[in-house]
Amino acid sequence: MSKDDVIQMAGEVVENLPNAMFRVKLENGHVFLGHISGKMRMHYIRILPGDKVTVEMTPYDLTRARIIFRAK
């Protein structure tokens, strides 16, 4: 899968879950499971409920996504 296949969207973290997983709500109301990308783990970027984030979703599984950016 190339990087052109991913879908980027903006959302808000609703809930922290174990193992660095988060419940994220998109602007259109869709709620799904998100995990932190590797670079965010490497740089110890913390995510809390209420944070605005950018997520990447694959067209194959729209119930999970990778959190790639946390807005300030």
Swiss-Prot record:
Pfam family, one: eIF-1a
Cellular component terms (Gene Ontology): cytosol
Subcellular localization(s) per the UniProt record: Cytoplasm
Biological function: One of the essential components for the initiation of protein synthesis. Stabilizes the binding of IF-2 and IF-3 on the 30S subunit to which N-formylmethionyl-tRNA(fMet) subsequently binds. Helps modulate mRNA selection, yielding the 30S pre-initiation complex (PIC). Upon addition of the 50S ribosomal subunit IF-1, IF-2 and IF-3 are released leaving the mature 70S translation initiation complex.
All residue ranges annotated as the S1-like domain in the record: 1-72
Domain of life from the UniProt record: Bacteria
Record text on subunit structure and interactions: Component of the 30S ribosomal translation pre-initiation complex which assembles on the 30S ribosome in the order IF-2 and IF-3, IF-1 and N-formylmethionyl-tRNA(fMet); mRNA recruitment can occur at any time during PIC assembly.
Entry protein name: Translation initiation factor IF-1 1
Homology family: Belongs to the IF-1 family.
One of the record's GO molecular function terms: ribosome binding
UniProt KW Cytoplasm keyword: yes
Keyword check for RNA-binding: yes
Entry keyword set: Cytoplasm, Initiation factor, Protein biosynthesis, RNA-binding, rRNA-binding
PROSITE patterns, A to Z: S1_IF1_TYPE
